[in-house]
């Protein structure tokens, strides 16, 4: 089973936490980890920029890449946000199974378009 680690930076810690909560609720990700605020340095509009940002580490399944990207782009305040999808070389079988179960409707099918598993 494959698992993706998705790296996203965000300027607002509270908005970033709301974003992660939304993504977990919609089963686009199994979990998200918010790293403490750090400093990013980059060129934008021809000049060096310095921004305080939190880094999000999101775990998902490859089938959710497109809907996850769309949702992040929809909610993110940046014109060009950092969204990096990294395929894990190796993941323990139990963790991969948990990620898949957390990102699916329980039948192995992704719920990537925002479907949330309803009552059984």
Question: Where are the predicted features?
Answer:
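Positively charged, small/polar-rich N-terminal and surface patches that mediate targeting and assembly
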Residues: 1-120
